[in-house]
């Protein structure tokens, strides 16, 4: 199946989805459908939600006063944010319960949906003269007790809680506790051990403990963007989602990532893997330019996300954005916030255009010499019309023509009307010019209905 039957040469990119689907043999059918294009996915019919997370530092500082919350509310409203995720625990620090309740109630009174978030890090005792390890050894009974305590505390405040993607383990033969337990269970490799251990951690100290405090609580597991290492570090997206009942996916794409469309692939693939239980995509402003930051937002929406979670208030809006998880200064995040503000009206229009649409696949456009142009083309159908959304991920302008001389009709361009230009280069040679890091949506000039087999 091709999106552009009449425009330039193209190649189908299915490698990302194929890698994910190959995690489990029973997903072979889903893999074939995704790569072949004959199975279409329909994006949710309800309005897209833009949400933002607020980490422990901002909850304890900027947001702990009426004045600070008022400034935040003003920005949220200007930027389509209607839902907040307040973090209760991170890296050994917590927001006290009374402050969580105060902030929850204040934001709800201002008209926002408010949920909770836990980042399960630094639950082990620190070594003498040092700090607790960032990644937790889950064979430590004290760590399990501390996680259960935080799960209970969060469940008493919120009915919906997302667990950030730090449930994985790095323990190996150097960890005496885990090595002994692995040998006792006669497990073949560390990947099997970590996956079994993560199931126990999820069922016990998180889900079971939280539901004792609040029978209505819904915990959500968030999967990281580093899909290549899921299974060896403990993540099983099929059984994990089944346990939690819902999941999220990280759609972050750093500057150095060779596949800028990874977030789109992960978003669609996780929705398939979870049986439609993936609530949305999560992206942040770490290690990326402002252009790449809004590109993540576009790809999250184009991947079919029901909700886009911008992580986080601290990076984008706090006076001191602090350090990244890698110990580096988050030095470009304020510029990312400005870029998001310029883009968000267009993102909302893009999400509304895709609302209830049938996604028909996506492809990289290639030049006649066979080189990847850095422009991805995403097809969808809505209201009896076929559309194509093109994203230019490069620093250069891209241009292509319609071989059959059919006219293009522009529907949307981002970040502004000049980003995508539909022009005439001769009487019978319509052309499209897409500016650097621009997005253009237009009606497919070859708009005949496809047959049921997709050809």
Located regions from the model:
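N-terminal Sec-pathway targeting helices
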Residues: 1-9
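Bacterial N-terminal signal peptides
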Residues: 10-22
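Helix-centric, low-specificity signal for extended rod-like, repetitive segments
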Residues: 17, 24-26, 187
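Signal peptide processing junction and immediate N-terminal pro/mature segment
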Residues: 21-33
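Glycan-processing catalytic domains of CAZymes
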Residues: 30-405, 415-438, 442-450, 454
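Short glycine/Trp-rich loop-beta-loop segment that forms part of the substrate-binding cleft
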Residues: 411
């Amino acid at each position: 199946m091709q999106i552009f039957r009449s425009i330039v040469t193209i190649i189908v990119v299915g490698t990302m989805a194929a890698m994910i689907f190959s995690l489990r043999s029973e997903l072979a059918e889903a893999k074939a459908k995704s790569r072949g294009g004959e199975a279409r996915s329909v994006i949710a019919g309800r309005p897209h939600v833009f949400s933002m997370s607020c980490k422990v530092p901002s909850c304890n500082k900027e947001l702990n006063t009426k004045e600070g919350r008022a400034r935040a509310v003003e920005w949220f409203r200007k930027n389509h944010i209607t839902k907040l995720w307040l973090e209760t625990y991170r890296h050994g620090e917590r927001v006290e319960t009374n402050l969580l309740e105060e902030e929850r109630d204040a934001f709800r009174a201002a008209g926002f949906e408010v949920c909770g978030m836990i980042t399960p890090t630094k639950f082990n005792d620190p070594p003498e003269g040092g700090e607790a390890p960032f990644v937790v050894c889950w064979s430590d009974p004290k760590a399990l007790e501390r996680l259960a305590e935080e799960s209970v505390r969060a469940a008493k405040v919120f009915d919906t809680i997302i667990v950030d993607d730090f449930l994985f383990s790095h323990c190996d033969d150097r960890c005496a506790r885990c090595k002994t337990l692995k040998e006792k269970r006669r497990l073949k490799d560390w990947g099997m051990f970590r996956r079994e251990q993560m199931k126990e951690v999820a069922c016990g100290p998180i889900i079971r403990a939280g539901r004792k405090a609040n029978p209505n609580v819904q915990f959500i597991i968030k999967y990281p963007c580093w899909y290549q290492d899921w299974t060896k570090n403990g993540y099983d997206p099929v059984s994990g989602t089944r346990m939690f009942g819902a999941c999220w996916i990280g759609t972050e794409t750093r500057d150095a990532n060779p596949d800028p469309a990874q977030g789109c692939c992960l978003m669609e693939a996780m929705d398939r893997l979870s049986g439609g239980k993936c609530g949305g995509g999560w992206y942040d402003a770490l290690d990326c330019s402002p252009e790449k930051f809004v590109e993540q937002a576009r790809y999250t929406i184009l991947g079919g996300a029901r909700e886009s979670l911008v992580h986080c208030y601290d990076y984008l809006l706090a006076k001191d954005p602090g350090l990244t998880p890698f110990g580096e200064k988050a030095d470009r995040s304020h510029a990312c916030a400005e870029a998001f503000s310029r883009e968000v009206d267009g993102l909302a229009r893009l999400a509304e255009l895709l609302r209830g649409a049938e996604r028909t696949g996506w492809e990289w456009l290639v030049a006649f010499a066979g080189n990847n142009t850095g422009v991805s083309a995403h097809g969808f159908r809505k209201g009896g019309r076929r559309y194509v959304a093109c994203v230019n991920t490069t620093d250069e302008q891209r241009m292509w023509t319609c071989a059959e001389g059919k006219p293009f009709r522009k529907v949307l361009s981002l970040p502004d009307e000049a980003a995508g230009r539909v022009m005439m280069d001769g009487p019978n040679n319509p052309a499209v010019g897409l500016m650097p890091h621009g997005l253009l949506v237009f009606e497919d000039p070859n708009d005949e209905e496809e047959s049921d087999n997709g050809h």
